[in-house]
Amino acid sequence: MESPEEPGASMDENYFVNYTFKDRSHSGRVAQGIMKLCLEEELFADVTISVEGREFQLHRLVLSAQSCFFRSMFTSNLKEAHNRVIVLQDVSESVFQLLVDYIYHGTVKLRAEELQEIYEVSDMYQLTSLFEECSRFLARTVQVGNCLQVMWLADRHSDPELYTAAKHCAKTHLAQLQNTEEFLHLPHHLLTDIISDGVPCSQNPTEAIEAWINFNKEEREAFAESLRTSLKEIGENVHIYLIGKESSRTHSLAVSLHCAEDDSISVSGQNSLCHQITAACKHGGDLYVVGGSIPRRMWKCNNATVDWEWCAPLPRDRLQHTLVSVPGKDAIYSLGGKTLQDTLSNAVIYYRVGDNVWTETTQLEVAVSGAAGANLNGIIYLLGGEENDLDFFTKPSRLIQCFDTETDKCHVKPYVLPFAGRMHAAVHKDLVFIVAEGDSLVCYNPLLDSFTRLCLPEAWSSAPSLWKIASCNGSIYVFRDRYKKGDANTYKLDPATSAVTVTRGIKVLLTNLQFVLA
């Protein structure tokens, strides 16, 4: 008589008789094999697409897998479902070649001169990922010369992110646009949306409205009253704060700067702070600083009244931590830093502005201090700083840590920064501009996981120990961390063209900058 099997024995024995084998690389290998047959050996083409006289030998299966437009075409009762040759009229041959490259290879070289056509055609052919990337590219490169055209385009394609970027450019450069053909032919509803969104007084929006009406007065006079009623003018606000010290004083100073569109920068205010500022950020129109004789204390400077108010202190003392504003949650996050015992911290806490309360949340993957921080769509990018080595001594860090404020989860990017140690960062659209020790200025694109090193003027070759950076009015401003008294020259970088201009003659008392906030 056979003895009963012990639990789990039959599974072990059956392993030698039969089992299910799952090849985890099978799907990828099949896809590679199909694409090799289609591309390298040019086999099994079953449809010819004719564009401007050029014929593309393609595959219905591949086109349908990537595009709902082609899938519907080939599975419908239309003649295109059965025809061997299909003629497309709404796309140029060069742009269709780019679409074919994308559909078959997953890569495409986007060129500025063809970008708007690729944007429109990728939406028409329902290539969603390509359409979204074109939208991001257009939003990054929108400028005075094309903002109205891009705004019109985004409106037609129901693209709110691109529309907002183009509208912001239009309303802040309205004085330059008001006599252009694009502005004078602008549809009424787009003009209304621009002027009702808050146009700076310096852009003379009333003159722009009159110019638009007078271009076709007979038909547009009826809109005059509604346009004047819709107009919302806003004053010029302070955009950048410098926090630092004068060589002869121990107290920190907060200097507010007004950055005008004509590249001029003027000092619009100055306030005395406490002895030692350990962290600072700008949230909305207010300035928040942490430090003083008790390092956990926090103050807010109300920009409207220029009064300092005490806020709830941090739960514990921290030095060299990073403060980052997250407007979408109306919160300020404090990340990393050092304890008073000089131990690196991986703590993350956030301050709910409306409730005046600090709350602890999950920790960083790696404890760091003195890192640069940048908020991009609710994700905080913590860049560089100092971390512990294997012997628990500190070393310059090249890590990029990403803290998601929606999920309260942190992860470290699988790649590192092109430089290490202390750095400063500013967000422009969906890019992070990073300046480090020496003459390094890098544009980091988190969506593409790419870095671009920017060319800088020769003046940067004699760089100080560290530069500071801020994003304001669609430009990147770069400041020295040390100045001679009364010498506060700064550089202004246009992200769209990489052109650099120098702003001279800012009269401030600061000789040592600690923070630059925008």
Swiss-Prot record:
PROSITE patterns (alphabetical): BTB
BTB domain location is 45-112
Residue intervals of the BACK domain: 147-239
CDD domains to which the protein is assigned, alphabetical: BACK_KBTBD4, BTB_POZ_KBTBD4
UniProt Kelch repeat ranges:
239-285, 286-328, 331-378, 380-430, 432-481
Alphabetically sorted, this entry's keywords are: Kelch repeat, Repeat
Q: Which SMART domains match?
A: BACK (SM00875), BTB (SM00225)
Q: Which InterPro entries match?
A: BACK, BTB-kelch_protein, BTB/POZ_dom, KBTBD4, KBTBD4_BACK, KBTBD4_BTB_POZ, Kelch-typ_b-propeller, Kelch_2
UniProt function note? Substrate-specific adapter of a BCR (BTB-CUL3-RBX1) E3 ubiquitin ligase complex which targets CoREST corepressor complex components RCOR1, KDM1A/LSD1 and HDAC2 for proteasomal degradation. RCOR1 is likely to be the primary target while degradation of KDM1A and HDAC2 is likely due to their association with RCOR1. Also targets RCOR3, MIER2 and MIER3 for proteasomal degradation as well as associated proteins ZNF217 and RREB1. Degradation is dependent on the presence of an ELM2 domain in the target proteins.
Q: How does it assemble?
A: Component of the BCR(KBTBD4) E3 ubiquitin ligase complex, at least composed of CUL3, KBTBD4 and RBX1.
What is the protein's given name? Kelch repeat and BTB domain-containing protein 4
